[in-house]
């Protein structure tokens, strides 16, 4: 996906373009999210960064990056938000299939609810209608033999 192909200089340029400082922790978080295959929680990011960045700074940075539409937040139903890097022109729209046992995440690019969004928006006179949909199941590795 596009988000994994962005280099750190492009991401820091986006920060500067939004009149935000390019701090060490922000660079570390962006660089880590560039390499992640799946959305990561603030705690997972903090654990991977270790003493390089405290947990409160991770949360503040993720909140800022989300407000700038550089990351997207996902809720997998376990009480822990997860974050994924967005590309410059990426709306981040895709879904996930999550194993209820091992928490393995598979990215799903198919999206059928777009036409439903249009009908709902028209029927209720809403604009900018969107959705967030995640699928849950048991992966082959966790299924009983």
Regions found by a protein language model. Give the residues of each.
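Short, Lys/Arg-enriched N-terminal segment that forms or immediately precedes the first helix
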Residues: 5-19
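Short, leucine-enriched amphipathic alpha-helices that occur as contiguous helical runs
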Residues: 8, 25-26
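Short capping segments at the starts of secondary-structure elements
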Residues: 22-24, 35-41
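Pre-recognition alpha-helix immediately N-terminal to the DNA-recognition helix
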Residues: 27-32
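A short acidic, leucine-rich amphipathic alpha-helix
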Residues: 44-49
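Basic amphipathic alpha-helical segments that dock to polyanions
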Residues: 58-68
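Non-DNA-binding regulatory cores of transcription-related proteins
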Residues: 68-145
